[in-house]
């Protein structure tokens, strides 16, 4: 297992593939190994093999992450309907990751479902109200003709990135108060 992980990190794909296939010969129901193999194939743009691995992993051990991975592959291969379905299923299983909603929104944008794009991105902002997510939602609002909302979000994102003057004062080092130096006490024995 360590060989497979190390090889993937070092981009030694052939070695990683051999290690993972060896694991699967011994334990053919190892969903994690199928997931890793799918990631490996996706990195090499062998999308058909990647999808097959993720689907096997999903059938062995249903998980939101393997569905998300399948969704990403379908998105990459421009099969947006299947990508949408995969992301929807992943969100049904685990709906607390902003990245999942952002990926789903990107697919909906390709399909032309503006309302679903905005709903997904609003949920992403709710989960992770950081400047990057706010800017993505602002762009979606612009595309939907809601420029006032977009501008409001951009201002909010900029505010988050720019420290205010009151927080600058709070962060500024305070001068040390001068302490009176006392003579040490005399010890009487």
Locate predicted features:
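Short coil turns that delineate tetratricopeptide repeat
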Residues: 28, 61-62, 95, 128-129, ...
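Register position in tetratricopeptide repeats
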Residues: 9-10, 43-44, 76-77, 110, ...
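TPR alpha-solenoid repeat register
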Residues: 33, 66-67, 100, 133-134, ...
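Alpha-helical segment of the N-proximal tetratricopeptide repeat
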Residues: 1-32, 36-39, 43
